[in-house]
Amino acid sequence: MQKIKSLMTRQGLRSPQESVHDLSPIENLRFPTKEELRESWEEPTDPQAQQEIINSIEEVYFSNDAFDIVKYELERLPPVLSLQELEEYRDKLKQQQAAELERVTSLQNGLQLAAVICADGRRHLNIAKEGFTQTSLGLLANQRKRQLLIGLLKSLRTIKTLQRTDVRLSEMLEEEDYPGAIQLCLECQKAASTFKHYSCISELNSKLQDTLEQIEEQLDVALSKICKNFDINHYTKVQQAYRLLGKTQTAMDQLHMHFTQAIHNTVFQVVLGYVELCAGNTDTKFQKLQYKDLCTHITSDSYIPCLADLCKALWEVMLSYYRTMQWHENHDQDEAATVSSVSDGSSVVGTEENSFDRSYVKKKLEHGLSRIWQDVQLKVKTYLLGTDLSNFKYDDFIFVLDVISRLMQVGEEFCGSKSEVLQESIRKQSVNYFKTYHRTRLEELRMFLENETWELCPVKSSFDILQLHEFKFMVQSRSPSVSPSKQPASAISTTVTLFEQYCNGGNPFEIQADSKDDETEDVLASNGYESDEQEKSAYQEYDSDSDVPEELKRDYVDEQTGDAPMKSVSRETLRSRKKSDYSLNKGNAPILTNTTLNVVRLVGKYMQMMNILKPIAFDVIHFMSQLFDYYLYAVYTFFGRNDTFESTGLGLSSSRLRTTLNRIQESLIDLEVSADPTGTLTAAEERKEKVPSPHLSHLVVLTSGSSLYGLAERVVATESLVFLAEQFEFLQPHLDAVMPAAKKPFLQQFYSQTVSTANELRKPVYWIVAAKAIDYEQMLLLMANVKWDVKEIMSQHNVYVDSLLKEFEEFNRRLNEVSKRVRIPLIVSNILWEHCMRLANRTLVEGYANVKKCSNEGRALMQLDFQQFLMKLEKLTDIRPIPDKEFVETYIKAYYLTENDMERWIKEHREYSTKHLTNLVNVCLGSHINKKARQKLLAAIDDIDRPKR
């Protein structure tokens, strides 16, 4: 270590600090020339390598100025020195020293250069001091001129930008950025006013004004587009643009003009399109026609699609208006919320102005609702009345009514209007159509009735008119038909308006495919009874048991007292069924014909039309009543009219029924079809409202005794009329609900005087069967051959009683045969039996009245015969009491009355004819009445008969 230190001392090694201190002062330095400096700068060095060497120097060497480098290096030497390691370490230190010295040299060169620059600066400063006074004023002048030129350049650039603004404005208009275009134009006008001292600005101002007017025109066009297809973003831009222009109220006035024009243009284009499409290549210039004249060129085939498209197009216009109002309501609410949140006094004036504009817009929009709807009504009215719809198909006309009804619903939701214009126009068309339609249907009904064979139409026992397609519309309207689970949903759906439902898409006037084809009417049965074999056997057994001879009954009872066979039914069970409703009356299908079903369907169609268009309810109900009237009149004419039996005076046809039939004949039946057609116009018009009387089909035979003179056909006809009356009774609440209050007396009269008389038609219809089914004339002949002036009381009844009972047994057999073809309701069976028994009893009285001589024993024989007849008859029928039983008994017993009692009896019993009373008095002569008394009694009879003459 001592060797190394001494070696370093001898070599005169110094620290870098000492080397720096020994540098000569700057004054003694020789300034290098520019060439030397350039050469020193251009010497190639590797900065990266140099930096790596410097970085390898330990930081301890630079820690402080008092650091002893020699001591530090000596202390780092290892205890055992190696010459090779020392040399390597020395070389490393040399590299580090060389690198550091190079930096020092570089710093020295930099300092020398700085000294040269400073010297040059001092020299130039001295020169500047000498020249500053001469050039300073010139410099300031140039600077001022420069500033002025910069300002001029800025103005020229602004003017240039203003000149080129029209390009940007055109782009913004193409982009439909109307607020931005107006704002830019207004800013340009404001900027142009700043440079009005330039001569080119006046031309620019004129150009900007023209541009602003052009923007307003395009803005008006954009506003008109709202009328057919409302777009929120588009309308928001338009309103913002008008607000920038300060023309909010003007915009609203223009908007209503555009809506009015849109309605006119829309309907004209729709109708024109269909007219040109149907006209083909004709040369007619339809574009020049007025809308009213154009509507008359619509063909029947294109009428419905054109109407649908017309309503769809008008819906779009009204929907746009609705959405416009909705936009303003939402916008006003947003603005009100904004104003309430910002309470700045400086904006009070602007707020009041905006409030006034909003109030004006709101009133204008509300007033415009009725105006627009009125325009829509007038356009649709013109279209409706432009074509005669009287020859349209029913479904097509119902579709027209449905569309107009939907349109009126739109009007009510749109502005609360009752659509009087539409109602009146569609009422005219409906009445006109319905008269033609009803006239055709009446002619069809006459044709059906004249071709009707009165066969049973097999429908199911569960048949209900609501199952028919024509009455489907009633199912939705009846609350009981809606299940409780569906009621909340339906209630919610009813609160949603059409505008809310179709606000975001769709159209309420889209033609829906008729779903009727997808539905099936499950009303027809494979047979008329739709019952199982047990029910059929019970029904047939009942038929055969209800009115059979006593022998068959006795066998039947005997069977029941023994072992009952399988599927047998007790007589008590059958009788209880009979008392309830003639066996399967309730469980079986109703009795009706194809014609009846057609009338019911027709009534459904009439009600469907009435439901859609309530203003013509009275006309529809009046025509419905004519359908029932004609059906009733036809049944009476075919099966109930018989002047011979009407003259019996038994009151078969009630006064109400006769009044009804006379009214129908006078108001509905054309009795002059075969007469000379020449006559007054008034008579011809009246006859147009009438229908010829129907004629019974030649296929229906009413003269055959084996079929009980067409009893099956009579039952089907009469009971189908009763069924039809029941359906009218069922529909009465629905008809009453739509009938105008002023016309309700007509409906009440129709039900009380016409519908309720259907049951009364049974008597005259079945009376004819009862009058022909039993040979009453033969019974009179047999009674005439009986000797009544016998002297002893007889114990055996006369043969005419057995003959009459055989007639009843034969009647029962035929009735049973008929019941196999057609179910005979209990009430019909009872009426037939009542008629037969009443006629038989009256025939007995007639026979007794023909007796010339009769003794007391003969009267007793009459009582014996009648009691025998009653006893046997009561076994054939369950009807109690026997009709006209007292009529016979009273007449027989009157023989025994004294003079005074008989006179009183004659005055009290006016149900007997003059012949009956006269014969009674004559037979009693010589027995207990003398001639004087006879004259007195005959005079009393004459007094009673005189008012009848």
UniProtKB/Swiss-Prot annotation:
Residues 569-581 have a biased composition (Basic and acidic residues). GO terms for molecular function: SNARE binding. It is found in: Recycling endosome; Membrane. The keyword Glycosyltransferase does not apply. Acts as a component of the EARP complex that is involved in endocytic recycling. The EARP complex associates with Rab4-positive endosomes and promotes recycling of internalized transferrin receptor (TFRC) to the plasma membrane. Component of the endosome-associated retrograde protein (EARP) complex. This is Syndetin. It comes from Gallus gallus (Chicken).
